[in-house]
C-alpha cells in the first residue's frame, strides 16, 4: 500500500458510476475491497449505506430559508473539495453505535483519530511494537519533505495546507471502518459526497446554530 504507487483518493473518486450517478461502480468497488485488510472497505461501504453516519456543522450564519440541505452540502464542498471556505469550518463527524446505550463514535479524519474500539486496539498494538528508541511519530507518520516526492493523494493526509512538507498517517498500521468511510466521503470527489448525502440520502448533514446545542453534542459524545 505504498503512497508512491497508489493514490487512494483518486480511486475513491471513481466509486460512482460515470454512466449512472445513482449507482456505485462495481468494478472499482471490487478492486478496492481487495486493497484493505479485515474487509475494511466492505464494512466502510456498509457504514455509508447504514444511515448511522452524521456530519454536524456549527452554523453561525446559515440562511434558514430555501433548501437548507443543499446549502449545507455546498458548505462541505467548499471546505473539503474547493478549499474556498472563507472561515474555519467547525464540524463533527459522528457515527451512531449499533450497540444499545453505547456512546456515539467520534471520527476525526484531519488528525486520523477515532474513538471506536477497533482504532484503540490497533493503536495500542502499535505502541507495544514500538522500540524504546523509536519515536511514535516516526512509526505512525510518513513525512515527505522532497517536493519531487509530493503526492496528490488526500487519503490519511495530515495538514494538507502545508506547502513545505507532506504528512501521511500510516493507515496500514491503524485504520477502522469509520475513518475509511468518512475518508471516502470527504477525501474523494464531489460526486461521491453527493451520492451518499443527496442521491441516496444515507449520510445526514445537520446544522446546529445554537452554541448550547453544540456544547451539548460534545457532552453527549463524552458520556
Curated annotation (Swiss-Prot):
Cystines in this chain: none
Main location per the UniProt record: nucleus
Keywords on record: DNA damage, DNA recombination, DNA repair, Nucleus
A GO CC annotation given for this chain: nucleus
GO biological process, one term: DNA recombination
Protein localization: Nucleus
Record note on quaternary structure: Component of the SHU complex composed of at least CSM2, PSY3, SHU1 and SHU2.
Family membership: Belongs to the SHU2 family.
Known role: Plays a role in a RAD51/RAD54-dependent homologous recombination repair (HRR) pathway to repair MMS-induced lesions during S-phase. Required for error-free repair of spontaneous and induced DNA lesions to protect the genome from mutation.
Record-given protein name: Suppressor of hydroxyurea sensitivity protein 2
Organism of derivation: Saccharomyces cerevisiae (strain FostersO) (Baker's yeast)
Organism lineage string: Eukaryota, Fungi, Dikarya, Ascomycota, Saccharomycotina
Amino acid at each position: 500500500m505504498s503512497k508512491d504507487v497508489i493514490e487512494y483518493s483518486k480511486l475513491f473518486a471513481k466509486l460512482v458510476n460515470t454512466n449512472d450517478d445513482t449507482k456505485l461502480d462495481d468494478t472499482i468497488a471490487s478492486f478496492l475491497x481487495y486493497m484493505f485488510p479485515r474487509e475494511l472497505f466492505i464494512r466502510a461501504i456498509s457504514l455509508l449505506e447504514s444511515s448511522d453516519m452524521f456530519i454536524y456543522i456549527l452554523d453561525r450564519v446559515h440562511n434558514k430559508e430555501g433548501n437548507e440541505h443543499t446549502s449545507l452540502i455546498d458548505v462541505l464542498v467548499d471546505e473539503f473539495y474547493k478549499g474556498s471556505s472563507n472561515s474555519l469550518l467547525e464540524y463533527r463527524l459522528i457515527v451512531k453505535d449499533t450497540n444499545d446505550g453505547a456512546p456515539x463514535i467520534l471520527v476525526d479524519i484531519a488528525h486520523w483519530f477515532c474513538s471506536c474500539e477497533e482504532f484503540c486496539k490497533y493503536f495500542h498494538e502499535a505502541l507495544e511494537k514500538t522500540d524504546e528508541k523509536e519515536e511514535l511519530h516516526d512509526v505512525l507518520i510518513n513525512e515527505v519533505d522532497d517536493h519531487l516526492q509530493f503526492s496528490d493523494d488526500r487519503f490519511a493526509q495530515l495538514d494538507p495546507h502545508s506547502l513545505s512538507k507532506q504528512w501521511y498517517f500510516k493507515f496500514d498500521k491503524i485504520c477502522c471502518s469509520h475513518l475509511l468511510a468518512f475518508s471516502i466521503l470527504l477525501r474523494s470527489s464531489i460526486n461521491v459526497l453527493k451520492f451518499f448525502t443527496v442521491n441516496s440520502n444515507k449520510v445526514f448533514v445537520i446544522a446546529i446554530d445554537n452554541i448550547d446545542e453544540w456544547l451539548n453534542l460534545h457532552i453527549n459524545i463524552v458520556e
